[in-house]
Swiss-Prot record:
GO terms for molecular function: magnesium ion binding; phosphopyruvate hydratase activity. SMART domains: Enolase_C, Enolase_N. The keyword Disulfide bond does not apply. Catalyzes the reversible conversion of 2-phosphoglycerate (2-PG) into phosphoenolpyruvate (PEP). It is essential for the degradation of carbohydrates via glycolysis. Keywords: Cytoplasm, Glycolysis, Lyase, Magnesium, Metal-binding, Secreted. This is Enolase. One of its GO terms (cellular component) is phosphopyruvate hydratase complex. It holds the Pfam family Enolase_N. The active site is at E205 (proton donor), K338 (proton acceptor). It is found in: Cytoplasm; Secreted; Cell surface. It catalyses: (2R)-2-phosphoglycerate = phosphoenolpyruvate + H2O. Pathway: Carbohydrate degradation; glycolysis; pyruvate from D-glyceraldehyde 3-phosphate: step 4/5. The gene is eno.
Length: 426
């Protein structure tokens, strides 16, 4: 029986230059594997707690030495000797050790690092790819990427209110071809921005961060880039938005679009989205309303839920009990899956199972503070979720996930690229 022999954590850096945890697990056969935990910029207030040191003399208070020490002492002490391949049991032990609903004691960053590293070590010891270990024989589907090519909101220092403008390459036969087309659109977009004397600096997730007069102009120029790159807008490559509207809302559920000098209530904002969807081939809107605006979400779902994908990120925070509330209220039809919002791989799997049971799409997602760790690429294939959101075709911490998916596609001798089949169930 494979057991856990040793566990340790190290403070390393993420893509924003902030500290994060690298956890390593060593098994009884001396197999070793590590995992680096990501970190978000715009976070849902119901997310599991990311433990920071708050020592202003180090990393402006963002150090993670306390979380590392929790791994190196408490977690290590209680997990050594446990069966390594019983992921659910180990993850439950981690939850019990912490004793709070949101990992306020040990830190979700400490717990997730160990959970990820354990899965990776067990897969390695069994000589299995991570996607096969987690997903079994049915892990065959390559996801449609949601590529963030223009950044706004909290991910960029510009005048755009919406956080992400994305492209989805649906009309292709393979992940490789879908990614190639997306890269060509990205480079074409850069040329168009250069021609307009717009900034081509990039945001946290590799998308460009230009200044526009309103939130519609990015849709226009992305549409132009798709067509100029030689692809059919809407048929081969569609559009998607992450509004991150919890960053725009006030206590009265009015939404402040500062880039357009507008203040809209929930119903007015939904009407605005309907205009955009009618004019552009937008197939997905994430966090279209605030995480607390359940009434607004119900209206949005009623108005657009049969037409496009409505993704809850801050709304659901990868939490099965909150998702259950959404299901009961007929809110949204998709959920963003971020393991660090909930704490362990097993809890993440529980949320995915619930979502799939109720025909909610699952989008496996990175965070804005990332690393070279490509765990979520394997995770998306393992769970056949059909969608992955992991940034643009720039910045090596984003490319690491795409390159891993290319490797997996090659290993699977093509696998199944879901493409246009993604939304056919609806």
């Amino acid at each position: 029986m494979l057991t856990i022999k040793d566990i340790h954590a190290l403070e390393v850096m993420d893509s924003r230059g902030n500290p994060t945890i690298q956890a390593s697990v060593i098994l009884s056969d001396n197999t070793k594997a590590s995992a680096i935990v990501p970190s978000g910029a715009s976070t849902g207030k119901r997310e599991a707690l990311e433990l920071r040191d708050n020592d202003k003399t180090r990393f402006l208070g963002k150090g993670v030495l306390r979380a590392c020490e929790n791994v190196n002492s408490v977690i290590k002490h209680h997990l050594i000797g446990l069966e390594a391949t019983n992921q659910a049991f180990v993850d439950e032990r981690l939850r019990a050790l912490d004793g709070t609903p949101n990992y306020a004691n040990l830190g979700a960053n400490a717990v997730l690092g160990v959970s990820m590293a354990l899965a990776r070590a067990s897969a390695k010891a069994l000589n299995l790819p991570l996607y096969r270990y987690l997903g079994g024989a049915n892990a065959l589907t390559l996801p449609v990427p949601m590529l963030n090519i223009i950044n706004g909101g909290t991910h960029a220092n510009n005048s755009i209110d919406f956080q992400e403008y994305m492209i989805m390459p649906l009309g292709f036969e393979s992940f490789k071809e879908a990614l190639r087309a997306s890269a060509e659109v990205y480079h074409t977009l850069k040329k168009l921005l250069d021609e307009k004397n717009q900034l081509t600096s990039v945001g946290d997730e590799g998308g460009f961060a230009p200044n526009f007069n309103n939130n519609v102009e990015p849709l226009e120029i992305i549409s132009q880039a798709i067509e100029k790159a030689g692809y059919k807008l809407g048929e081969e490559i569609a559009l998607a938005l992450d509004v991150a509207s919890s960053e725009l809302v006030d206590e009265h559920f009015n939404y402040h679009l500062k880039g357009e000098n507008k203040i809209l209530d929930s119903h007015e904002l939904v009407a605005y989205y309907k205009e955009l969807v009618a004019k552009y081939p937008i197939v997905s809107i994430e966090d279209g309303l605030s995480e607390d605006d359940w009434e607004g979400w119900a209206f949005l779902s009623k108005e657009l839920g049969r037409q496009i994908q409505l993704v809850g990120d801050d709304l659901f925070v990868t939490n099965a009990s909150i998702l259950q509330k959404g299901i009961e209220k007929n809110v949204a039809n998709a959920i963003l899956i971020k393991p660090n919002q909930i704490g362990t791989i097993s809890e993440t799997l529980e949320t995915i199972r619930l979502a799939k049971h109720h025909a909610y799409q699952c989008v496996i997602s990175h965070r804005s503070g990332e690393s070279e760790d490509s765990f979520i690429a394997d995770f998306a294939v393992a769970l056949n979720t059909g969608e992955i959101k992991t940034g643009s075709t720039a910045r090596s911490e984003r490319i690491a996930k795409y390159n891993r998916l290319l490797e997996i596609e090659h290993e699977l001798k093509g696998g199944i690229y879901i493409g246009k089949e993604l939304f056919k169930h609806g």
